[in-house]
A protein has these predicted regions:
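Soluble non-transmembrane domains of integral membrane proteins
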Residues: 1-259
Length: 262
């Protein structure tokens, strides 16, 4: 934050977004806004490094269990990597309580939002949604949705089907949120949209940002069948040393630094 214009304050990632990182997203489509999980969850267990929530979604007849666990990652010498203090493992278990087979192929995991943390920050330089698929990083800024000389305006996008989708997320100049699916939880789509966010520390000035969700694998569930999805979520600083050290566990995660691209 520009200390000449904005008083010092703590930064909360995704603060101005009403939806939480790791929330379930339904009906992901390029033609309409998705719906979000409104299940009322209850905490059922807690340890020193994890918490488990459970709830029932009557509209979809799904019993849902979500466990958030701190996820320290070690290097080859057994030392915990500093960047892993910003990692959480999310495990989602779904139980189909319907008497019918359910098709959940348009479901996803919400990756939160990113936006400038000061109104003086360049609007289209550092804020991106991004994804890594087929060995390369793709990223777009908020104006991608407003159109220009060579493109038309779009309210939202659903990218895919994508090959080998290893991660997706959002980033601002200093912070990033990255969804990292385990192999069995890899999907092939990424949903993104542009949104205006108020900066509370700057008299609620609106700034443009981006929002992202990652699709789950094509999923059908028989009655009383349980499916489990697992994602590691990095929510922390865009600090090259942290991300570079995590490359061994999460290949190419440091590509979001994109030196020489911006």
């Amino acid at each position: 934050v520009d200390s000449q214009k904005v008083a010092d304050h703590n930064i909360t990632i995704n603060e101005a977004q009403q939806r939480g990182i790791g929330e379930l997203v339904f009906n992901m489509d390029a033609t309409q806004d998705p719906s979000y999980d409104n299940t009322v969850y209850k905490e059922v267990s807690r340890t020193a490094d994890s918490v488990t929530l459970e709830g029932y979604d009557p509209a979809r007849q799904l019993f849902i269990s979500k466990t958030y666990t701190l996820h320290p990652v070690k290097n080859l010498e057994g030392k915990v990597l500093p960047g892993s203090k910003y990692l959480i493992r999310l495990t989602v278990s779904l139980l189909n309580k319907s008497s019918n087979v359910q098709d959940l192929r348009y479901m996803g995991i919400f990756g939160g939002s990113a936006y400038p943390i000061a109104k003086s920050e360049p609007k289209d330089t550092y804020t991106h949604f991004f994804y890594h698929a087929d060995g390369s990083l793709e990223q777009e800024v908020p104006s991608y949705f407003t159109g220009g000389f060579f493109s038309t305006a779009k309210a939202r996008v659903l990218e895919g089907p994508l090959q080998d989708l290893t991660y997706a997320g959002v980033m601002s100049q200093y912070y990033a949120t990255i969804l990292l699916p385990q192999n069995e939880s890899k999907g092939s789509t990424v949903y993104a949209t542009r949104q205006e966010f108020p900066l509370a520390h700057e008299n609620n000035t609106l700034v443009p940002g981006v929002t992202v969700a990652m699709g789950i694998p094509n999923l059908t569930m028989a009655p009383n069948e349980i499916k489990t999805l697992t994602y590691d979520i990095y929510t922390g600083p865009k600090f090259n040393a942290y991300l570079r050290d995590l490359n061994l566990t999460y290949p190419a995660i440091s590509d979001i630094m994109a030196y020489g691209w911006l």
